[in-house]
Regions:
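NTP-dependent small-molecule kinase module
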Residues: 2-7, 32, 148-215
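Conserved lysine of the Walker
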Residues: 24
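ATP-dependent small-molecule kinase phosphotransfer cores
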Residues: 38-132
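Pre-Walker A (Motif I) flank of P-loop NTPase domains
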Residues: 9-13
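Walker A (P-loop) phosphate-binding loop of P-loop NTPases
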Residues: 21
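Hydrophobic positions on the alpha1 helix immediately C-terminal to the Walker A/P-loop
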Residues: 27
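Hydrophobic anchor at the beta1->P-loop junction of P-loop NTPases
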Residues: 16
Length: 215
């Protein structure tokens, strides 16, 4: 994001980002399991869909039956999911001093609805910042995967996964551009690496951020 955003003084907020099939769900679960084994309270969540409102948004934006949506409609639907998610799930957990791990957050909107849809990035960012109260993760882990390889892992595709290869290539570049503008905030990892090696890289980075977490 172009703005430094707002970071909480309590808890730890870690976000996993990247294209389809990059292993975000696997690595977020591994990180949760390790942190819990170290005595930390952890909330594992995801976007879109981890609230009652979000489930309805997820159904609309991902179902192939939805068909075409205007770009602005899609941006606003994802923003609605984020607003509800931050207000009812993410912020309360951070205020309790927990570690919050989310599978996707604002960068996904910037990469998919901004770069992927070739929409005005500043407009997309402004909407997402407002929806999330400008709350930013303390660390964003970007699992970088070549789109053809990542998409090849799916037998059935949802509405977004079913977009063209060119769309997903723009999304990948959008993620990399975000990381390139703020390299200190991101941990960019080649998703082709072995699962355990990726996990070790993530653990090594997270260890240094645990000081503000209440066990």
């Amino acid at each position: 994001m172009t703005s430094p955003g707002r970071f909480t003084d309590t808890g730890l907020f870690v976000c996993f980002e990247g294209g389809e099939g990059g292993g975000k769900s696997t690595q977020s679960r591994l990180l949760k399991d390790w942190l819990e084994s170290e005595g930390h309270r952890v909330l594992l969540t995801f976007e879109p869909g981890d609230t009652a409102v979000g489930k309805e948004v997820r159904r609309i934006v991902l179902s192939p039956q939805t068909g075409e949506l205007s770009n602005r409609t899609e941006v606003l639907l994802y923003a609605a999911d984020k607003a509800e998610h931050v207000d009812t799930v993410v912020l309360p957990a951070l205020e309790r001093g927990e570690v919050v791990i989310t599978d996707r957050y604002v960068d996904s909107a910037l990469a998919y609805q901004g770069a992927g849809r070739v929409e005005d990035l500043s407009g997309v960012e402004a909407v997402q910042r407002w929806a999330t109260r400008d709350l930013r993760p303390h660390l964003t882990v970007l699992l970088d995967v070549e789109p053809a390889a990542g998409l090849g892992r799916f037998e059935e595709r949802d509405r977004i996964e079913g977009e063209s290869l060119e769309f997903h290539q723009r999304v990948r570049q959008g993620f990399l551009d975000l990381a390139g503008r703020d390299p200190g905030h991101y941990l960019v990892i080649d998703a082709r690496l072995p699962i355990d090696e990726i996990h070790e890289l993530i653990r090594a980075r997270v260890v240094g951020l645990l000081g503000q977490v209440t066990s």
